[in-house]
Amino acid sequence: MKVCLVGSSGGHLTHLYMLKPFWQDQDRFWVTFPKPDAQSLLVDETMIPCYYPTNRSLKALLINTRLAWKVLRKERPDLIISTGAAVAVPFFYLGKLLGAKTMYIEIFDRIDSPTLTGKLVYPVTDRFIVQWEELKRVYPKAINLGSIF
């Protein structure tokens, strides 16, 4: 199985990295910001840099949508996993169009309110994971797996 792990650097990337027992034996590639923390964490991984900053930026959305189209058509992942943030949105929507399964994990510090990215990708996510039972009120089809820490 080929896996695309997409997320912002910092805490979002740390959450994805903590899933190592799942992805370590998979054919995989990462999409994240080309920042020092990401580059040092993913030194032995295939990392595709995306455009940032992405916070509610139409320019970033357009650039990263073009990147997602190019990358997803070339790599053809079976599964796209993200913990956010905005860079995940075009990868999830275009990934679904290209037949990929999607899994979104709402970030740990969201206990009872959704992230913008979570709200945007929820409609196209095959498995939506929350880490707090309270978030199931916001995301009824979510699965609460508890903390990934």
Task: Report the location of each language-model feature.
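Extreme N-terminal starter segment of soluble prokaryotic enzymes
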Residues: 1-4
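Conserved nucleotide-sugar phosphate-binding/catalytic loop shared by glycosyltransferases and other
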Residues: 7-9, 25-64, 134, 145-148
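Histidine-anchored nucleotide/phosphate-binding helix
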Residues: 14-21, 92-93
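An aromatic- and histidine-rich active-site surface loop
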Residues: 79-98
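Active-site-proximal region of nucleotide-activated glycan assembly enzymes
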Residues: 100-149
